[in-house]
Design a protein with these regions (language model features):
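Extreme N-terminal leader/targeting segments of oxidoreductases
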Residues: 1-18, 36-37
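Mid-domain catalytic core of redox enzymes
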Residues: 6, 237-346, 354-355
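Conserved flavin/dinucleotide-binding core of flavoenzymes
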Residues: 6, 320-430
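N-terminal Rossmann-like FAD-binding beta1-loop-alpha1 element of flavoenzymes
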Residues: 16-43
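Glycine-rich FAD pyrophosphate-binding loop
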Residues: 35-59
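A short alpha-helix-loop-beta-strand transition element characteristic
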Residues: 56, 79-100, 166-173, 278, ...
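Dinucleotide-binding Rossmann-like beta1-alpha1 core, especially the glycine-rich loop
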Residues: 60-148, 155-157
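Active-site/ligand-binding neighborhood in enzyme catalytic cores
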Residues: 126, 133-238, 242-243, 254
Length: 430
């Protein structure tokens, strides 16, 4: 939702308000919990609209999310906080289509999609022993409380998979494309805790799209919040325990400051060490009269080379994403942010022509999004995201991805937990 008009609204709030910097999911979740206890707050958002990474544009009847984003319905905190029915969630098929040696192979969860059992068994992704190891891994990660995964020993995912006996073939042809598609990490160097948690979530729920785009998630979180407590186009220049100073020079006082921004911005404002590197992506959208695939699968590049990381047809998943008679195609490229838009589009078309034939040249380019900080790197050891640290400084709190795990689940949970900590610290003064 575009809230640009809010920047002109009255800021005369009680002096004891909590100042939340950032109107992404973590900031909104924090505000909702504070509101339950009637704690005054104000949200300051640098962008002209809320949602953090979850933004959506509508162009000529096509719904374009800013980058490849999905909602995993098995996320515990998302199930608790969000109304899935109102979001109109539409699921991808449980599995993926992986391109290997110039051919497409359908890999599906045989328990949830039994009609694709034979194609899954026939796919040249590894040995029968590898398939049994996958089944064993799925059983192991689904035991007990999902949060207990973050108490396990941590190591790079590549090392973890090798320790479980997986062959080089299945690592290269299945796990690398899978992890590249989910975590933008084709070398699978990220935390094995993160990998195991993601693997569990994929096996327990659907990968889905809200019918009106990913921005609908933030819009739903915002609906219960007082509109005059959210101020967009308000970049914070500096913070201190008693308030913040905006880029405009305006000072806003409060009883506490909660940083709910992306990792690099949190580090800047808090004056702490910058987090590790970022995973960037380029997301290109095309319109076509005929889709390149007929089923609602994510298409992954398992060739070990090429520019394209993944391809989806959102309009097959949720018909609302494209006007009648058209389909929406989304293509993700990892990194390559130094290549200009025209060159990226030309190279992507050339590569996809090898995949799908000359009809790719008839696709109409709609828009290209460049996301420099699509995800932070997630090396081991990853901290337990269910445990929030106390205030970084007296009166200053941090929620969201900084020092934790990125993703919808953890943004919602960290926002709620940080609000709980603020409430606890404010209790003696109420």
């Amino acid at each position: 939702m575009n809230l640009a008009v809010i920047r002109e609204m009255n800021m005369n709030l009680p002096d004891k308000k909590v100042i939340i910097v950032g109107a992404g999911l973590a900031g909104l979740a924090c505000a909702r919990r504070l509101m339950e206890d009637d704690i005054p707050f104000i949200i300051l958002e640098a962008d002209r609209r809320i949602g953090g990474r979850l933004k959506t544009d509508t162009i000529d009847g096509f719904i374009l999310n800013h980058g490849f984003h999905v909602l995993q319905t098995a996320y515990p905190e998302a199930r608790r906080v969000l109304n899935y029915d109102r979001l109109g969630l539409k699921p991808f098929a449980p599995g993926a289509i992986i391109r290997i040696d110039g051919r497409f192979h359908r890999i599906a969860d045989p328990w949830r999609h039994p009609r694709d059992l034979w194609s899954t068994l026939a796919a040249p992704i590894g040995t029968m022993g590898d398939r049994l190891r996958i089944a064993r891994l799925a059983l192991n990660v689904r035991r007990g409380n999902p949060y207990r995964i973050f108490e396990k020993p941590d190591m790079p995912t590549m090392e973890f998979l090798r320790s479980k006996g997986f062959s080089k073939k299945i690592i290269d042809r299945f796990f690398k494309p899978f992890f590249a598609g989910v975590c933008l990490d084709p070398d699978i160097e990220a935390s094995s805790r993160v990998f195991q948690y993601i693997f569990r979530i994929f096996s327990e729920g659907d990968v889905s799209l809200p019918d009106e785009g990913m921005a609908a998630i933030a819009d739903q979180l915002m609906q219960d919040l007082p509109i005059d407590r959210i101020r967009t186009s308000s970049r914070v220049e500096s913070i201190h325990p008693g308030g913040v100073v905006l880029e405009s020079g305006k000072a806003i006082d409060g009883c506490a400051v909660v940083l709910a921004t992306e990792g690099p911005e949190t580090a800047r404002l808090a004056g702490t060490a910058k987090p590790g590197g970022s995973r960037g992506e380029i997301c290109l959208y095309f319109a076509a009269k005929q889709p390149p695939v007929d089923d609602p699968y994510i298409v992954l590049n398992g060739e070990g080379r090429g520019l394209v990381n993944s391809l989806t047809v959102p309009s097959i998943v949720a018909r609302n994403y494209a006007p009648a008679g058209q389909h929406l195609i989304s293509v993700v490229v990892i990194g390559r942010l130094n290549i200009d838009d025209r060159s990226v589009e030309a190279d992507v078309r050339e590569e996809l022509t090898q995949w799908f034939g000359p009809e790719v040249n008839d696709w109409c380019h709609l828009k290209t999004y460049r996301i420099v900080h699509a995800l932070p790197e997630q090396p081991p050891p990853m901290p337990d995201p269910t445990v929030r640290s106390a205030a970084k400084k007296t009166g200053i709190y941090v929620c969201g991805e900084y020092g934790s795990v990125p993703g919808i689940q953890w943004a919602l949970l960290s926002g709620h937990q940080t609000a709980e900590q603020v409430l606890k610290d404010l209790e003696p003064h109420r």
